[in-house]
């Protein structure tokens, strides 16, 4: 859900940090700290602004002031934000379920969770999310923002259609 939240609005610091730190972003906590230390909140209010500023600042490998590690990190940031921008662009014309399938395939996240402990439950959770996205598309609401609100309201009111763990065990 964090990825959906930043597809909708990348200026949300907590979801952005979570995705950057996740297997989708592959950034370490130390790298996130370097980015934030280089671009403190007094200069860049949001992590997104700090990270894009860092990526631009260290983009030139021929600049002697640019440390090799910073240049490499800047390149990874540019790749990450290009991928995010692709998802944001696709969110404008793909159906929600199609977008989710695309993101899961493109990011390799579905394959990643398949190799983790509890893979069946994790896959069942993603399959349930895809089912809910399909059902959501049949309502009068549309878009990533509305879907995130819908899922958050389900969590808030503890609505659970079925345990993903039970579904995984039945497969």
PLM segments and residue spans:
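Conserved helicase C-terminal RecA-like lobe
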Residues: 2-171
């Amino acid at each position: 859900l964090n990825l959906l939240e930043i597809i909708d609005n990348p200026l949300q610091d907590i979801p952005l940090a979570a995705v950057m730190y996740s297997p989708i972003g592959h950034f370490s906590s130390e790298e996130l700290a370097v980015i934030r230390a280089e671009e403190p909140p007094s200069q860049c209010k949001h992590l997104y602004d700090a990270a894009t500023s860092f990526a631009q600042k260290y983009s030139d490998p021929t600049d002697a002031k640019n440390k090799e590690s910073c240049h490499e990190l800047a390149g990874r940031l540019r790749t990450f934000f290009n991928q995010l921008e692709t998802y944001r662009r696709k969110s404008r014309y793909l159906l929600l379920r199609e977008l989710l399938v695309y993101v899961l395939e493109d990011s390799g996240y579905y394959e990643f969770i398949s190799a983790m402990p509890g893979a069946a439950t994790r896959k069942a959770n993603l399959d349930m999310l895809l089912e809910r996205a399909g059902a959501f598309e049949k309502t009068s609401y549309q878009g990533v923002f509305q879907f995130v609100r819908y899922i958050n309201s389900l969590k808030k009111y503890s609505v659970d259609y079925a345990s993903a763990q039970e579904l995984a065990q039945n497969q």
